[in-house]
A protein has these predicted regions:
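Hydrophobic structural segments
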Residues: 1-181
Length: 181
């Protein structure tokens, strides 16, 4: 089934995460089938409303329903649970296992969007190798152009070091705080 496939592909049981991540199926739907999937970063009430309105049976999120820890089932927490139950919307969350995935993770996806191919990792977070390590030769200005094109955002270059980059590390998300300057 889909949940088993996701759990296996993303190595849910193998990768340590923050205690409130609660990776995997967080809420099942009452009919047990999936024909339409919605995806979002956070499992917020507005996101769940949009997913339900679109007729989704499954909402895939990066930060799940319990990210803030234990909470009483009142207010917006109750509204989220009731909405999902009434709409038949299952919720599946995947945090660090998705971040660290060698082909589906943000680091690998960004590398490919830049026209670069990761050749390994360069750090460990919670005991798991992560961060896309790239060995290439690319001019700083060319890399900045590719980054602007891939992200649609303006890139600010703080030039330093050689004009040609030969080793690049890509680290998305909060784990960048674990890299010493």
């Amino acid at each position: 089934d889909l949940v088993t496939h996701l759990d296996t592909e993303l190595r849910i049981s193998e990768i340590e995460d923050y205690s409130n991540a609660l990776n995997g199926l967080q809420m099942e739907n009452h009919h047990g089938t999936v024909s339409k999937i919605a995806a979002a970063v956070d499992a917020t009430l507005p996101v769940m409303r949009k997913a339900a309105a679109a007729g989704a049976d499954l909402l895939l999120v990066h930060h799940g329903m319990f990210w803030s820890g234990l909470q009483s089932w009142t207010g917006h927490v109750f509204q989220k649970l009731k909405l999902c139950h009434d709409a038949g919307l299952a919720v599946y969350s995947c945090h660090l296992p998705l971040d660290f995935h060698p082909t589906l993770g943000n680091d690998a996806v960004l590398a490919r969007a830049l026209g670069l191919e990761p050749c390994g990792t360069f750090m460990k977070t919670k005991g798991t190798e992560n961060g896309a390590r790239i060995e290439t030769e690319i001019a700083r200005d060319e890399l900045a152009k590719r980054l602007e094109s891939a992200t649609g955002a303006r890139v600010h270059v703080c030039a330093g070091g050689p004009e040609i980059a030969r080793r690049i590390g890509i680290m998305t998300g909060g784990a960048g705080a674990e890299v010493a300057a």
